[in-house]
């Protein structure tokens, strides 16, 4: 396979717009994974720790593309947010990680919280295994409801 490419954009406007949804566009202005080009984008000018977290998020999408069946948006973004959250935590930015955890967005914030709940149940390796085998949450009747019952 071709290696991944990293492109740094001068501004959010220079990152390719792959989404037509305005909400998604607002969330993808600091980083983006472009599967067909095997390219990760990040906007220049942010602190190292933040750029590291953004690239970890995008790298999670690359990993999902190569190791997982096609997945629903909430699973894709929830898992990538979990990877990003772990990087932020490991770099010592607990207050930023807490803000990520509290994000009300049903795809990113709730997805992160559900992945953290699953990690508590099965560990990080167990979470990776589950993500590798899941297609989408709708096939689980409601994956979120299942986790709420745990």
Predicted regions and their residues:
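Auxiliary, metal-adjacent structural segments of Zn-dependent hydrolase domains
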Residues: 1-39, 44-45
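Short pre-active-site segment immediately N-terminal to the catalytic Zn-binding motif
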Residues: 35-55, 69-71
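Active-site recognition of the HExxH zinc-binding catalytic motif
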Residues: 53-66, 77, 81
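Post-HExxH zinc-binding segment in Zn-dependent metallohydrolases
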Residues: 68-108
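Pan-zinc metallopeptidase signature
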Residues: 102-150
């Amino acid at each position: 396979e071709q290696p991944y490419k990293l492109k740094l954009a001068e501004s959010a406007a220079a990152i390719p717009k792959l989404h037509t949804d305005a909400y998604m566009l607002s969330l993808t202005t600091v980083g983006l994974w472009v599967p067909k080009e095997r390219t990760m984008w990040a906007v220049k000018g942010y602190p190292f720790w933040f750029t590291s977290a953004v690239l970890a998020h995008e790298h999670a999408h690359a990993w999902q593309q190569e190791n997982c069946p096609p997945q629903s948006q909430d699973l894709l973004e929830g898992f990538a947010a979990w990877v990003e959250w772990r990087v932020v935590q490991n770099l010592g930015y607990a207050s930023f990680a807490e803000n990520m955890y509290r994000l009300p967005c049903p795809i990113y914030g709730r997805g992160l919280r559900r992945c953290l709940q699953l990690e508590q149940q099965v560990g990080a390796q167990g979470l990776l295994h589950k993500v590798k085998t899941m297609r989408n949450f709708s096939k689980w009747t409601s994956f979120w409801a299942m986790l709420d019952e745990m």
